[in-house]
Design a protein with these regions (language model features):
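N-terminal membrane topogenesis motif
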Residues: 1-13, 67-69, 100-101, 191-204, ...
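Interfacial segments at transmembrane-helix termini and the short loops linking adjacent helices
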Residues: 27, 31, 91-108, 290-322
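Helix-loop junctions and terminal segments of transmembrane helices
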Residues: 44-63, 126-127, 237, 241-265, ...
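Membrane-interface junctions at transmembrane-helix termini in multi-pass inner-membrane proteins
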Residues: 54-63, 113-138, 262, 316-346
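Hydrophobic alpha-helical transmembrane segments
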Residues: 101-109, 135-183, 238, 347-350, ...
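Interhelical loop/hinge segments that connect adjacent transmembrane helices in multipass membrane
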Residues: 132-137, 159-166, 171-215, 255-268, ...
Length: 401
């Protein structure tokens, strides 16, 4: 509930950003920012390496040692990602890429310098059940970032208004999480072995990278195949259509995994999670899809009215997305990250192939393909979880009757 309220607040503030950039920036400028954001988000997925989840799942007597090892891994990993992103920007510039995109990628890299000093505290806070406070911090950071984006768009209408606030709000996040759950580490604690982190983390890391590709690779393909203007239109359609569902899915994955880990009846908890999440999101996105022809030109302006059909289609893709998010959390809680990785990779490849094949037909064709592929691929990938949550429980009740 806390994460849901947080996402509602962030989406409300994000709406003002969408309205501002639609009126202040050209589709090409938005497309340039979208390309940088897509590249940055794919690289940022590498921070989701399962280290924090090892802290959440650690036994009490191993906690200090686990945190000590985790802190070292976080620093090593984030500094490495900073270097990689700087190298990507330099390489992109060297091969003749847009100077503005290079600068935007460099700005996004600055986030990695703040993250490692607070990631252990975040995991410990989640372990302690401080979900409401974590949600408030995450939501507060995004709201402040969105307010800054609107202010910058008014005084400095350029692509960087969608990027710079991420870096400017990173210190707020760091100070807040360190204050929420202070932890300095015990110098006498014996660090746990790194191998368990690697054994668990490789699959989780692969999952998160593939998940980021599922969310962002189509945007890069649209930019490469159709140009920055088409990417700007596609990016705005996604923000107006699937943005709500994407945020809800992120919040759901954050809270459902620890809930399933702690549950004595995992099947019942999964069944409750699927039923509740679909019950909440499905009516909202259906209404959103129906109203898109009215609210898109009203909010974004008449110049963007052509996007209303694409927005309506993409709204409906939220339903299979939320179903798959619940199933993926169950697989991870069951210790099946490799199965989740395989399923996520297949879904991602299907969506990328859809974009590549339908790009010549335009954005509406891509959107219809995205919806169809999402419904089929994500439902098939979620079948093991659906079986555990519903069919197995039904069989057990019939046997006991």
């Amino acid at each position: 509930m806390a994460f849901g309220a947080s996402e509602l607040a962030t989406k409300a503030s994000r709406l003002f950003v969408v309205i501002a950039v639609a009126r202040m920036l050209s589709p090409s400028e938005i497309g340039i920012a979208a390309a940088a954001l897509a590249m940055g988000d794919i690289l940022k997925a590498l921070t989701e390496n399962g280290v924090g989840q090892r802290i959440i799942a650690a036994k009490d007597h191993d906690l200090e040692g686990t945190c000590t090892t985790a802190r070292r891994l976080f620093w090593f990993w984030c500094l490495g990602l900073f270097a990689v992103q700087v190298a990507v920007a330099a390489l992109f510039w060297a091969i003749g890429g847009s100077v503005m995109i290079c600068l935007l990628i460099l700005v996004l890299a600055g986030e990695y310098l703040f993250m490692p000093a607070g990631l252990v505290q975040v995991a410990l806070a989640m372990r302690a059940g401080k979900m409401r406070s974590i949600a408030a911090i995450a939501g507060g950071q995004v709201v402040i970032s969105n307010i800054l984006s609107v202010a910058l768009a008014i005084v400095w209408p350029a692509a960087i208004v969608l990027i710079l606030p991420r870096l400017l709000t990173a210190p707020f996040w760091l100070m807040a999480v360190r204050r929420l759950h202070p932890w300095q580490g015990n110098p006498n604690a014996h660090p746990t072995a790194i191998r368990p982190f690697l054994t668990f983390g490789w699959a989780v890391l692969g999952i998160e990278v593939v998940k980021a590709l599922r969310l962002q690779a189509d945007k890069l393909l649209v930019g490469l195949l159709l140009g920055p203007q088409a990417l700007g239109l596609y990016f705005m359609a996604f923000n107006a259509g699937l943005s709500l569902a994407s945020s809800f899915s992120v919040a759901l994955s954050v809270v459902l995994f620890p809930h399933l880990c702690a549950s004595k009846d995992r099947a019942a908890s999964l069944r409750q999670g699927i039923t509740l999440s679909l019950g909440l999101i499905a009516p909202v996105v259906v209404l959103q899809a129906v109203l898109a022809p009215w609210y898109v030109p009203l909010l974004l302006g008449d110049d963007w009215a052509q996007l209303s059909g694409v927005v309506s289609i993409l709204c409906l893709a939220a339903i299979p997305t939320v179903l798959w998010t619940s199933a993926a959390s169950w697989m991870r809680a069951e210790g099946r990250p490799a199965q989740e990785l395989k399923a996520t990779a297949l879904v991602t490849l299907a969506l990328m192939l859809n974009t590549f094949l339908l790009a010549p037909l335009g954005l509406t064709a891509i959107a219809w393909g995205y919806l169809l592929v999402s419904c089929i691929a994500m439902t098939l990938a979620a079948l093991p979880a659906l079986n555990a949550a519903f069919l197995s429980a039904t069989k057990e009740r019939l046997q006991n009757a």
